[in-house]
Amino acid sequence: MKKTMVVLAHPNMENSAVNKKWIEELQKCSDKILIHDLHKEYPNCIFNVDKEHELLENVDNVIFQFPLYWYSSPPILKKWLDDVLLYGWAYGDDEMANYKMKDKKIGLAVTVGGPEESYSKNGSIGFSMDEVLIPFKATIKYIGGIELPSFIFYDAVPETGDAKINESAKKYSDYILNL
């Protein structure tokens, strides 16, 4: 089986119900899934770019897991993308070059506080989740990655029941294991 790296960008995992449960479920498959917690690994947001490149070069699939913050990712993921996906390594002008992110399967696993119906043209947000995630999708395309369907959990609020969270964790694990 191919190895998948989950790049976790949650600034407060201790108080997360959904993301925490997802990670607990994925840890059962540590031989197939590498969980890379950016906040734990880099609390000061100063990345070891060579180490990050080595990790990425040794996996087939990458999943960016994060809570939606103001219709984007937490700042640490944006900084990671800026610092790690470098010109000449992840992308460039030479169509014949072997850029390291080319043809990697890349997906998004996102938790959202609001209900799914809010994310539509007629919903309170006025945009679909696909539209909200366009900057990430454009990045994947630009670096030559293969975009995977996004895994989205709506209504990620403290009142969300354990049964719904547990069910989503199993589905998330299956989603990754079947890449």
Spans of model-derived segments:
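N-terminal beta1-alpha1 ligand-phosphate binding loop
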Residues: 1-32, 171-173
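Generic recognition of short, well-ordered alpha-helical segments
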Residues: 17-21, 47, 75-79, 163
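Short histidine/acidic/glycine/proline-rich micro-motifs that form metal-
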Residues: 11-13, 40-43, 126, 155-159
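Glycine-rich phosphate/pyrophosphate-binding loop and the adjoining helix
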Residues: 23-27, 133-179
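A short beta-strand-loop structural module common to alpha/beta enzyme folds
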Residues: 32-45
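Helix-loop-strand module that forms the ligand-binding subsite of alpha/beta enzymes
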Residues: 50-137
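Hydrophobic/aromatic beta-strand patches that form the interior of the parallel beta-sheet core
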Residues: 5-7, 36, 63, 107-109, ...
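Glycine-rich, highly charged phosphate/nucleotide-binding loops
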Residues: 43-59, 168-171
